[in-house]
Amino acid sequence: MDVTKKNKRDGSEVTERIITETVSTRLTSLPPKGGTSNGYAKTGSLSGGSRLEKHSLTHGSSGYINSSGSTRGNASTSSYRRAHSPASTLPNSPGSTFERKIHITRHGTYEGSSSGNSSPEYPRKEFASSSTRGRSQTRESEIRVRLQSASPSTRWTELDDVKRLLKGSRSASVSPTRNSSNTLPIPKKGTVETKMVTASSQSVSGTYDATILDANLPSHMWSSTLPAGSSMGTYHNNVTTQSSSLLNTNAYSAGSVFGVPNNMTSGSSTLHPGVSTCSSVFGMQNNLAPSSSTLSHSTATASTAYGMKKNLPQSPAVVSTGVSTSAACTTNVQNEDLLHKDCKFLILEKDNTPAKKEMELLIMTKDSGKVFTASPASIAATSFSDDTLKKEKQAAYTADTCLVSDANGDVKTVSTKGKAASAEMHNYNHRGGGSGGGGGGGGGGGGGPWGAAPAWCPCGSCCSWWKWLLGLLLTWLLLLGLLFGLIALAEEVRALKARVAELEQSRSNVLLFKEEMQRANKDWLQGEAPSVEAGGKLGLDGHQQEELWLFVRNRLMAEQENGNLRGSPGPKGDMGSQGPKGDRGLPGTPGIPGVLGHPGPQGPKGQKGSVGEPGMEGPMGQRGREGPMGPRGEPGPPGFGEKGDRGAAGEPGVQGPPGVPGSVGPKGSGGSPGPRGPPGPMGPQGLRGEVGLPGIKGDKGPLGSPGPKGDQGEKGPRGLTGEPGLRGLPGAVGEPGAKGAVGPAGPDGHQGPRGEQGLTGMPGTRGPPGPSGDPGKPGFTGPQGPQGLPGTPGRPGAKGEPGAPGRIMTSEGSSTITVPGPPGPPGAMGPPGPPGAPGPRGERGLAGESFMGSSSSISELLSTRSFKEPMQTCHRASFLEARVAKTTPALSGRHCVLDTCRKGVDLRGPPGPPGPPGPPDLPFRVRQDPEAPQVKAELPGKRYESIGTQSLGLALGKSLPATSPQHRVLETYFSGPPGPPGPPGPKGDQGSSSLGLNLQGPPGPRGPKGDKGGSSSSTMFMPGPPGPPGPPGPPGSISSSGREIQQYISEYLQSDSIRSYLSGVQGPPGPPGPPGPVTTIAGETFDYSELASRVSSYLQTSGYSIGSSVSISTEDIVAALQREYLRRAGGWEPWGLGLPLPELLRASEEALVLVPSGQGRPGCGRAVAREPCGLGGPTPALPVLAGDDVRQYLRQYVIGDWSLQSLDYAELSSRILSYMSSSGISIGLPGPPGPPGLPGTSYEELLSLLQGSEYRGIIGPPGPPGPPGIPGNAWSSISVEDLSSYLHTAGVSSIPGPPGPPGPPGPRGPPGVSGALATYAAENSDSFRSELISYLTSPDVRSFIVGPPGPPGPQGPPGDSRLVSMDGSYSRDSRSSSHSASVSRGSSYSSSMGIGGASGGSLGEAGAFGLDMGLGRGYGGAAEGGMYGGEGGPLGAGFAGGLDYNELAVRVSESLQRQGLLQGMAYTVQGPPGQPGPQGPPGISKVFSAYSNVTEDLMDFFRSKSTSVIVFLTPCCPVRGALQDHQVGLGHPALEGTREKKETKVTKSMRGGEREASPSSHELPLEEQPLASVLAMAYGVHVKISPKGGSWRLTSY
């Protein structure tokens, strides 16, 4: 539509031709419901890939501008555009159409120009700072406009930017110059450019008006004046690339200048080029967010926008709705009508846009030159340095932007009518202003009449008068309602206040009344005196009596309630008569509905019903489909025609001659058909025909011709920045670096965290003797016997056979751990001497006071209660605590009750006076966890109770992890390594006979004391190698019992079974060292030499003659106790599972038999012995401790706290001795030696048991060797096949790993060869096997069982079974000893002990811990000249008949290796030179039968190549921590011989190009990895972890 306006302004007549552009947009389908509407899933905005047809028809007419009589130019365009926007949110479904029309007026009016042929002029926008100019901006712009209007020749000279634009693409500075830190251009001038922009290819041209722009209305418009005919494309100005390119794209317009998008992101242009139809100037775009472009060109909506658009981060691809207004003279009413009637637009995607969006309205005002002012809410955050923007900031605070008008204060409202699913109204804050209001924009709302609302109305664009009226009425109603509500509420409050006051008044009155009543009662009772009656009696009147009665009654009732007056119960009253029947109770509440019952059984079938009446006739069914055509019918019968009429008779002719008979005439023609009969009745409906077969599939049609290529879609908005991706997988582990040089030993580590509660400290010094106790009742004085003659020493028996390995057993729960003891040859018992005559019984002494606290000892414990008396307190957790280094050994030879705790309750009493510290290097210390729950285990025949649920691992050579639950139970400590046993000393002289107790002579004097073992607060210590044998010591007296203890410990530590666990591959013997003090984790130090001296002093002070020879040794007592105890208990197990104490005491009472003379009984044999064995002849025995004297003394401690600290050893010893002498125990001469006994409990076994109990040091040295016994066979029922098959099936399987260090002690082993033990093993072989299996599969043990044993070492000389002299046995040459250690991540750990002894370990973050303890013999040792157990020892026959511990250890560990325990750990082993070993055993055929050939090949390869091999292990799973390059010195002297250690050459830096010497490598398949590690450790090669891939690489240098 064309509207012609005439304007009188500044003396020039301006005639405008208003061109109306009608844009018809047809929406071909509605958006899908619920669909997200943007192609970018990340941006969360609108997509859908729909199509929108848009017909844009622009009517252009030549507009002329008449100023001073000259025609300006022709600014007309006409174009028709049909565009398909492929990325619109509306799908292209032809079913639904949505049309809308937009009428946009353009005014191509140039006002005030002085030249007819020049382009419209605009003041040049300057972006430089105006601080250097002295004039204000308003004045400056005014002067420039006037100058440009006056002189047309110089009009373009100042407009540098516009001139560059006219030069085409050579221009590079249309936009303001700005640094990369600014996101907005900083305009310093107002502009008069008023071109209008639509984001969706509709364009509106503005009016070029050369009036002065008010400086208060800042415009962020980039201004240019293009002559008609020049076109310019989108100008990108990205912050990163400061380049500018003017793209002359395929714009349909004659003069379209696109704005300068300032994208912080490096996105595409904000407004897609080539979509506007008329000369249009796009405003400056400022994308403050990395979302998509602001004016979303991809959504082909008809929204229009002008000038600045600020896009918020929350609305990517939001359609910016703007207003196209035209600033003509407001005196022309027609223009205002046009403004409201035609400048309407529609947001199609309004439903999908966020509700609170900032949509700026960019308004052109009449006098300001159609400036688009934007007021985004965050504009105050931008850094503009000009006062223009400061003014704008003051005017543009709110997100609801403002429409600004200048000249006459009229508010030009723009209506946006949304025809989408919901038309959302937006409120805008319209401010009327003179020439300088701040401006903002926005869109939305519904239309309304002009000026319907006052200027302050926040919704002036949408409110009509009736809406205002309705709003006012509703507001008044609301206020009235509030008023009435408040009035009613006030009334209620007033009434409530009155009520409260009334209640308060009444309450106070009641209180006053009560108080007065109470006062009056007191006055009545107390204030009046009783009257004196006539008889002289005091009396009260009736009222007072009543009050007194009430008072007394109340008091009595109160007392009765308190229970003070309750008397004794009276006799039971007679039963009363039955009362009348009560009334019927009310009906109870209905109960909860019961549970739905089960369905009842099916009832009987009912009778058949009578025939029902026929139903009504149903409706006629649908007609069936046409059936298939029936077969052709049979031919019908022939038709019968009627005979024709007979013809008339002919005249008779002349009778001729008879002719030839004629032929038969033709048949007559058929008659006509008869009439059709009536139709017959309708036949019954035919059956429905079958569905026909599907037809043949038609041929494929010809390929259609390709459709025309669609128009290129507009570029979509830039998506949001993607979220950071997931973290990539870790890269492959790099090659292991070169091995660094061994660093110096690190400083001592910091003190570890505070350990758990330590064991009870050493008992204090002996206190002063207390006052004498009350004298006891005098005992019956027995007849004083004559002093017996000392017995002659018995002849030494033949050397005994080595016994079964000792076992250190602890119990915690159902798992027991057994460390095989060393097989020492138990000496046969010497024959007991002849009994001496009993001496006279002494007087009973006074009971002495206990001086050591509140504890008791074992002997007191036994004497405190009758052995036959039942005891209720059968076990305590503290009983089972084995204090190796804390408690004092119990009494020496006089203690007759030694091992009554073998099977169950620890009868340990309180600790005695503080013993001296023991020898060093006790490999373990067991502390029962007192918090462990009680667990009851059922064993055959008896019910035992065990304490503790976790398997108590004795960490020999290895510390439990600090986080494991066993850490509290087990504390291991090592100081220095024990020395090896010295050479056997000469046999000691036989002691003289005095009391008849045969105590062997002690070992010789000790050698020089060696260096003190290094103590550490850590629990990782490696025992060093043993020293060389010391010189034989001279015989000593019994006073050296402290040395005996040391010797016991030394023997125990040097026993083969302990060495096989403590040591890896053994080195040569080191120098002997003396025992050093043992330092525990808690820092306490024990010296066993001092301990021995204290025990000896106790024996001496007890009145016992030390030098005397006694025919009954403590071994007899121990053996008797053990034998009888086992015979009664039916099995054997040490201080872990317990009998109840009464049974235990009864057993000990019956077991303590002292056989003084007679022929010795045969020793206990295999599984047959059920009677006492091996003590002596059949002399009747007497219980030693059954006397009342000893019982009475010990009973107090049974009830006490079960500790040993308060026991008076002197008194206990004297009581026991006096009881023995008074009870007629005859200690006679020794009898002849008995016949060789069957193998009994080995001496080392008893030693090992006693080392872990309270009874260390009690047992004297063994007697002379007895004759060899018959070897037992307790293990014959368990074969290596059972073990290996179990290991394959019992879950001990994982990915194979290299061997590790030796592990902890094994489970409770089978009983040895003593009679009861063998019996137990024979009867419980299955349970033992299950125990072994459960132990081996427990995670605690699996973490320890790592390293395989080496091949057997060289055969050593046969040892002597007697205790060797302690001289030099612990001496060690400290000068040749060096020990360095470093435990760190990935570092190497090595140590060399003494003369080439090897000890090493490494602890990485994965917790692997290696240990090697080189002792002088091969793995498993050859103590008696053969394999384990000696040449003909009880266990030396292998698995078929006996048990070869060496073979068993090798096979079990190899099987564990094969099953892959402790995968990924490896150790570099390099041992010291050793002597060449004998020929090794054959290949590992039973377990590793498949690897025999591989073994030979590998050995040949190793021998042929060189000495050092690097084994690259490939751990299957990443080992936590760096075990790579962990190297542990672990040599095998037998196989390594005397060759020197050959180090691997590792260069300094891998980066410098230097590498390791080029190896020749052989790859092994993965299944042979365990073998490679076994061989590597066995042959002392370097083992190195390297994550190479699928195979192990054996590389030789």
From Swiss-Prot:
GO biological process, one term: hemidesmosome assembly
Post-translational modification: The intracellular/endo domain is disulfide-linked. Prolines at the third position of the tripeptide repeating unit (G-X-Y) are hydroxylated in some or all of the chains.
Residues of this chain annotated as glycosylated in UniProt: 1493
Taxonomic lineage of the native organism: Eukaryota, Metazoa, Chordata, Craniata, Vertebrata
Disulfide bonds: none
Chain spans, region Necessary for interaction with DST and for the recruitment of DST to hemidesmosome: 146-231
UniProt protein name: Collagen alpha-1(XVII) chain
Biased composition (Pro residues): 820-838, 910-922, 977-986, 1023-1035, 1296-1310, 1348-1357
GO molecular function: extracellular matrix structural constituent conferring tensile strength
Species in which this protein is naturally found: Canis lupus familiaris (Dog)
Residue ranges of the region described as Nonhelical region (NC1): 1573-1597
